[in-house]
Design a protein with these regions (language model features):
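Flexible, glycine-rich active-site loops centered on histidine and acidic residues
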Residues: 8-21, 81-117
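N-terminal beta1-alpha1-beta2 module of alpha/beta enzyme domains
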Residues: 1-71
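Glycine-rich, histidine-containing beta strand-loop boundary motifs that form or position
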Residues: 47, 72-74, 103-107
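Glycine-rich "substrate-gating" loop/helix at the edge of Rossmann-like oxidoreductase active sites
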Residues: 75-79
Length: 117
């Protein structure tokens, strides 16, 4: 981890942790710690049903890191906007204002599986 109050060396650069399918999502915590250690400014976490829940992973990453920004990508059409806003608000409070949200369109197969229009 960076020294408290230290600025990330590559503040404008980030990395996508846990790409694709994962067997053990806890690996993302180690990836975020390493990203912060080498001076990256942000990590990105995507949503993938039954494999990756960005809010849960972001909470774990926030606890394990000190300075790095944590961004979660959520499917815009798969949960009520107030639920996503509530998650983001809580993550901002719990992470020391290091959390950001990005919205993505859901894959049609996921939408069908979840019964979404």
């Amino acid at each position: 981890m960076n020294e408290p109050g230290a600025k990330a060396l590559f503040d404008k650069f980030g990395t996508y942790i846990l790409p694709g399918r994962v067997d053990d999502p806890r690996r993302g915590i180690d990836e975020a710690i390493e990203a912060e250690r080498i001076g990256l400014g942000a990590v990105w976490i995507s949503e993938r049903f039954a494999l990756k829940e960005p809010a849960v992973l972001a909470g774990a990453v926030a606890e394990a890191t000190d300075e790095i920004r944590i961004n979660g990508t959520f499917y815009a059409t798969m949960r009520h906007p107030l639920v996503t806003a509530s998650i983001a608000n809580m993550m901002q409070a719990m992470s020391g204002n290091r959390f950001g949200v990005m919205f993505a369109r859901a894959v049609p197969a996921y939408m069908k599986m979840m019964g979404a229009p």
